[in-house]
């Protein structure tokens, strides 16, 4: 009986301590924060304008930066990656320290003013020079043969290396899927005699390595390809501000249909509500001056950006 009474007293005492502690917390521990109305503009994390990663000065509200890498820059010698140069030019240590994130695009063909290649010389030799040298309205350069099996295999290996280096610490939040076509935009100028892009079964082999190498990054494609719908991707438009091209992009998204580069009747899939789950990105068009885009035709530019449900917009870097 004495033991039961002692146990009861202990329980009562414990209960009183809990009640007292709760009362103390309610009086002294609970804090109420009242926020005042402000006209100050705040940046949304991982949204908004993404300047180039090599910019020395960026606004305090910037949380995203854009980094594109050519294969020639990354792997000048087979199996030897120039991480030091890539990191120095794109200030990756700085952005990590400042808590910022990157949009990454890997590119194999950027038309320029001089004859050049954006794939390394060793890869040009390994693929038996399969591809097309061009000098056309876009500029000069070299378009690889993306159907070439050596090209496909080496691409997978290099993307894996990119993932090992940049895909493990959250630095890269978005992948604007490049790899194929001029500027990595998944199209080539067929009228200039350049071989058309591969069909879906081959295009998918360029896409899958990215999903595996960057499992925590969100991937965006230039068009609503059927393979993109299957894997769940966002979309990007590199002609932002150019009304005709942007309206065509909207039509691809709303209707799907034929991919004109390969004449696949169902190469594109309607993805009209993609923005509800996935990002909408891209860059401002280079065919219109920034004064026209952001001054003369500002209302038109704003309306096109709103219609695209834009998540982020990058700088035209090259």
What are these regions (language model features)?
Residues 32-146, 270, 279-317:
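N-terminal substrate-binding region of glycoside hydrolase catalytic domains
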Residues 41-43, 185-254:
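Extended amphipathic alpha-helical segments with heptad-repeat/coiled-coil character used for oligomerization
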Residues 71, 108-110, 179-181, 225-227:
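Active-site-proximal loop/turn and secondary-structure-junction residues that shape catalytic pockets
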Residues 2-19, 26:
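N-terminal Sec-pathway targeting helices
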Residues 102-105, 172-178, 218-223:
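A structural signal for short, well-ordered beta-strand segments and their strand-loop junctions
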Residues 224-228, 232-318:
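Substrate-binding cleft of secreted/luminal carbohydrate-active enzymes
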Residues 23-34:
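Sec-dependent signal peptide cleavage junction
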Residues 90-102, 123-176, 200-209, 213:
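An active-site-proximal structural segment forming one wall of the substrate-binding cleft
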């Amino acid at each position: 009986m004495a033991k039961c009474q002692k146990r009861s007293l202990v329980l009562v005492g414990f209960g009183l301590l809990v009640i007292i502690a709760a009362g103390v917390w309610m009086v002294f521990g609970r804090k109420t924060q009242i926020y005042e109305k402000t006209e100050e503009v705040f940046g949304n994390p991982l949204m908004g304008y993404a300047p180039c990663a090599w910019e020395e000065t960026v606004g305090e509200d910037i949380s995203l930066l854009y980094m594109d890498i050519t294969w020639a820059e990354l792997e000048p010698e087979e199996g030897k990656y120039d991480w030091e140069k890539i990191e120095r030019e794109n200030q990756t240590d700085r952005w990590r320290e400042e808590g910022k994130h990157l949009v990454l695009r890997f590119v194999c063909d950027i038309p320029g003013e001089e004859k050049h290649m954006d794939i390394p010389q060793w890869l040009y030799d390994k693929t038996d020079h399969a591809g097309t040298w061009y000098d056309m309205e876009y500029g000069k350069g070299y378009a690889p043969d993306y159907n070439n099996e050596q090209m496909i295999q080496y691409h997978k290996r290099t993307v894996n290396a990119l993932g090992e280096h940049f895909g493990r610490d959250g630095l890269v939040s978005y992948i604007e899927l490049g790899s194929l076509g001029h500027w990595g935009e998944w199209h080539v100028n067929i009228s200039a005699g350049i071989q058309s892009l591969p069909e879906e079964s081959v295009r998918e082999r360029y896409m899958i390595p990215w999903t595996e190498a960057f499992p925590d990054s969100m991937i965006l494609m230039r068009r609503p390809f059927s393979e993109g719908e299957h894997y769940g991707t966002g979309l990007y438009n590199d002609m932002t501000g150019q009304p005709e091209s942007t309206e065509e992009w909207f039509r691809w998204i709303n209707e799907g249909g034929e991919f004109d580069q390969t004449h696949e009747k169902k190469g594109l899939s309607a993805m009209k509500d993609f923005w509800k789950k996935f990002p909408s990105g891209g860059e401002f068009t280079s065919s219109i001056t920034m004064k026209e885009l952001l001054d003369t035709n500002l209302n038109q530019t704003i309306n096109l950006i709103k219609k695209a449900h834009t998540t982020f917009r990058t700088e035209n870097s090259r």
